[in-house]
From Swiss-Prot:
Residues 224-233 have a biased composition (Basic and acidic residues). This is Mediator of RNA polymerase II transcription subunit 8. It is found in: Nucleus. Belongs to the Mediator complex subunit 8 family. The gene is MED8. GO terms for cellular component: core mediator complex; mediator complex. Coiled coil: none annotated. It comes from Candida glabrata (strain ATCC 2001 / BCRC 20586 / JCM 3761 / NBRC 0622 / NRRL Y-65 / CBS 138) (Yeast). Keywords: Activator, Nucleus, Transcription, Transcription regulation.
Length: 233
């Protein structure tokens, strides 16, 4: 029987006519771009020497634009994605891709999303158990209107910022203007005092000639005009 069942499985050809290919490809491309941008920001923030603020701001603006694109794409294909049911084919490698299969077949929200929903309900102060369905629909409609308004305002501000000249050339000019200027040896920060020299000065009122602390104190005195602070031998 097992051989017959295996032969039947081999003869069955999957029907991909109902798969929403364009919708899935569009969402996949938008998510891939957003993931790449988020990974780049994470790498920039993980460096020992932080990236210049204007470069980081430019990257964040790109990421926000891609996030808006993902949201718009999901809204455009909302009906198609909501009506799509995911199920594995007989040849799906369940052993090597168990986590992916579990994620696709999950019926409940992940714990993080459940926590977000709980926090949102508590922050809204709305008790859905004590309200009628039409009242809940009005609240959801009002929330959608507010979200749409906020998205439009953000899009206008983003376009305004782009039109004001935050281009690559402007950022390069700004970067050159913010580069550190070379200073003379006298203007550079002096080396810190040595603990031993500080203790000697506090106890005896003098420091050893030629020490780094002596040089630092002498330089500071010359700059301030007060040369009587250090006691002579």
């Amino acid at each position: 029987m097992s051989g017959i069942n295996g032969a039947l499985v081999e003869d069955i050809k999957p029907d991909y006519s109902g798969v929403p290919g364009p919708a899935l490809d569009s969402v996949r491309m938008r998510l891939a771009q957003l993931t790449h941008s988020l990974r780049r920001i994470r790498d920039d923030l993980s460096r020992a020497d932080l990236t210049q603020w204007y470069s980081l701001q430019s990257q964040i603006n790109v990421t926000l634009s891609q996030l808006m694109s993902v949201t718009s794409t999901l809204q455009h294909f909302e009906d198609t994605l909501d009506s799509t049911i995911v199920y594995p084919l007989p040849k799906f490698p369940t052993t090597s891709h168990e986590s992916l299969l579990t994620t696709l077949l999950r019926k409940k929200n992940i714990p993080e999303v459940e926590e977000w929903i709980k926090d949102a309900i508590e922050a809204s102060g709305v008790d859905t158990n004590m309200m009628r369905d039409d009242e809940i629909e009005k609240i959801l409609e009002k929330n959608n209107e507010d979200s749409k308004w906020a998205l439009e305002v953000f899009a206008k501000e983003f376009e305004k910022r782009e039109s004001n000249g935050d281009t690559a050339d402007d950022l390069d000019v700004l970067g050159n203007a913010l580069k550190p200027v070379k200073t003379s040896v006298r203007q550079r920060a002096q080396s810190p005092f040595q603990v031993e020299d500080v203790l000697k000065y506090m106890s005896r009122g003098e420091v050893d000639r030629g020490s780094s602390s002596q040089e630092g104190l002498s330089t500071n005195n010359e700059q301030s005009g007060d040369k009587d602070i250090i006691m002579a031998d």
